[in-house]
Amino acid sequence: MLKPLENRVVLRVKEEEEKSMGGIVLTSASQEKPQTAEVIAVGEGKTTNHGTLISPLVKVGDTVIFEKFSGTTVKMDGEEFLILKDSDLLAIVE
């Protein structure tokens, strides 16, 4: 399993619908990049210059919305994950 460093999180991106609202099947080039994902792993946080640890606000299992073109995609054990900084997360879905 992946263990993110500092203030990074590992996400499993949720698959988006591959059809338009009119029922037309979209090619991968015309599809919007998904922005919703499940948090799989969370780093310990970032340490400030004064030595204070700032922990990420998300936890494993949270569903989050993230910035569209952020992060690094990684394949592991046949699955695709996204690693990004917690500052690239926009919201937690409740």
UniProtKB/Swiss-Prot annotation:
The question of whether Chaperone is a record keyword is answered with yes
What are the protein's GO molecular function terms?
A: ATP binding; metal ion binding; protein folding chaperone; protein-folding chaperone binding; unfolded protein binding
Q: Which UniProt keywords are given for this protein, alphabetically ordered?
A: Chaperone, Cytoplasm
Domain of life, per the record? Bacteria
This protein's assembly is summarised as: Heptamer of 7 subunits arranged in a ring. Interacts with the chaperonin GroEL.
As for what it does, the entry says: Together with the chaperonin GroEL, plays an essential role in assisting protein folding. The GroEL-GroES system forms a nano-cage that allows encapsulation of the non-native substrate proteins and provides a physical environment optimized to promote and accelerate protein folding. GroES binds to the apical surface of the GroEL ring, thereby capping the opening of the GroEL channel.
Q: What protein am I looking at?
A: Co-chaperonin GroES
